[in-house]
Amino acid sequence: DLTQFGNMINKMGQSVFDYIYYGCYCGWGGKGKPIDATDRCCFVHDCCYGKMGTYDTKWTSYNYEIQNGGIDCDEDPQKKELCECDRVAAICFANNRNTYNSNYFGHSSSKCTGTEQC
C-alpha cells in the first residue's frame, strides 16, 4: 500500500515527501514525458501499477524486509508483483538522487508535454 511504499523510500535513505509533487509523474496521475531520471522512476512505477489492471494497488498491503541494504518482497504472487513495483521505484529514487532537482518539486502539470508510452 502507499504507506508501505513511503516506508520503503524512507528506509532507502530518501524522504517520501520529496516525491509527492515532483515532476510530471510523481504523485497522483501523470502526463507528458518524464523530465529527468527521478521523474522517470515515477513514470515506470505508474506503468508497473497500470499493468496490474483493476488490482487495488494503493491500499493492498504486502510483506517485505529490508536486508543488507536491499528489499525482499512477499512470496504471495499478486502481492509480490505490487511489492516489486514499489521496490524497484524506491531503489530507483536512491540510485538517481543526484538527478533530483528541487525546482521540479511542485512542477505544474501544464508544463508536462509530449507523450511517453509504458
From Swiss-Prot:
Ca(2+) binds at Y25, G27, G29, D46. Binds 1 Ca(2+) ion. CDD domains: PLA2c (cd00125). Its main location: secreted. Its EC number is 3.1.1.4. Six disulfide bonds are present. InterPro entries: PLipase_A2 (IPR001211), PLipase_A2_Asp_AS (IPR033112), PLipase_A2_dom (IPR016090), PLipase_A2_dom_sf (IPR036444), PLipase_A2_His_AS (IPR033113). It is an enzyme of class 3 (hydrolase). Belongs to the phospholipase A2 family. Group II subfamily. D49 sub-subfamily. This is Acidic phospholipase A2.
